[in-house]
Amino acid sequence: MPARNPADVVVRSRYREAINFPDLTERLALRLSSVLSYMARAHFVAWHKKIGAPDFTDPAGIFTPLATVEIEVEDVAVDPRQPFQVRGETYLAKSVDQSGALRHLVRQGKHTVSDARGTLVARARLTNVFTRYHPDPARRRVTELPPEFGIGSVPSRVTELLGIEALIPEDRRPDFTEERERVWHYGQTDANRHVNGMEYLRSMEQFVADGLHRAGHDLRRLYFAGARLVYRKPCFRGEGYRRVAWYRGEAPLVVGGAFLKANDPPGARPAAAVELTLAQHD
């Protein structure tokens, strides 16, 4: 029997998490943009406790920022006095090109949140990519696990990375646009030294809601039930940006949006994309 690859370790978590009342809607349902805060211990803390955490003070170090996020939430009322039950697992994987050569090392996680009765409230799939902060794309790529992990160099598991092209069309004009430039601010950043991943979701939710309202949709009945996010390159405090969005489906209603950096040349690819799925209240 071949020796087990130590890089194929799976870290599992199971815990209770107190509900933060502002994370609930008027129907006492968990809002989409708050889901990941309840999964942080499962996806980040458990892994860092077992393998080790990055040194955020070392600009030359290896980091694992989120590259893709897939979230779904159920519009079910919960008891805010009873903690959520969180279950999750996280593991290493690699993506390869058509020839089978390694492209990226990643860490993925699959997590669920249930209420005290065991009713599913939310689920998510997260993917972090190993990278270095360097202006040269070739120098940013990490093709071997850091030796300090002590678990080998490359995992066996192969995965596919969600791409921006899966969320937004490239062959037609946006259905929603904004002409005025907006700017990211310091309060939207995190310890990875760039804009926090959930800020893109919150910003796009507001942009899409405004656009749907102008188009005649009834926002008293619609809610954001799911999101897929792809982060192609980071945004930083003080940077300007614009948002655009396209209708992607009708049943259910799906809107895909993109963030365009103000200083990028015309026709440049978006910095990030967010696909939102909407559902109706009963």
Residue ranges of each PLM-predicted region?
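Hydrophobic, proline/glycine-rich low-complexity stretches
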Residues: 1-95, 208, 212, 219-220, ...
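HotDog/MaoC-like acyl-thioester-processing domains
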Residues: 75-164, 231, 235-237, 247-282
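Short coil/loop residues immediately preceding or within conserved phosphate-binding loops
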Residues: 68, 108, 226
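Sterically constrained small-residue positions within well-ordered secondary structures
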Residues: 8, 62, 100-102, 117, ...
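Catalytic strand-loop segment that frames the active site of acyl-thioester-processing enzymes
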Residues: 1-38, 42-45, 125-143, 148-215
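Acidic/His-leaning functional-site neighborhoods
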Residues: 172-275
